[in-house]
């Protein structure tokens, strides 16, 4: 098995553990949707990792480590955005609807994501966060969609692969804290606890 595929499958398992730890208990009746959506979210990348692992390795090197524009690198390596490939495969394979919603959000709802992230970063002032969400009920509904758990779990798992305390990882931690209405300390404590549990 190519390293890139093994790495993606480990990230998918990690995402499932994060989803179960953070969300399954709170949304018990949706446990299966959360579990399978989290596990299968990155599956559209598995065939590329199996047949052309060097492309994903080059993407990781250039985008993650060197900070090049993802859009530009993906155009050169794949001819289209990687998210477009993933969404097309999600549709063809008829993967769970929450997986589809996650990719659609990343492709088409970036404005909402940025707004929510701005609110999430204000984690030291939960009352102010609450007021800002109360002032924008449409954004609150958008944030509170159960399908977002799949994206949050994969965001946490993917970013942890790069760095536990890097800016990318913190973004997903802030968003998870806002979604669950818990502090960053609680998010980080749960992250480390779940990492320790999965290492056993």
Where are these regions (language model features)?
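Active-site flanking loop/helix segments enriched in acidic
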Residues: 1-9, 67-73
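Alpha-helical phosphate/pyrophosphate-handling elements in metalloenzyme active cores
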Residues: 5-37
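Metal-dependent nucleotide-binding catalytic modules
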Residues: 29, 42-200
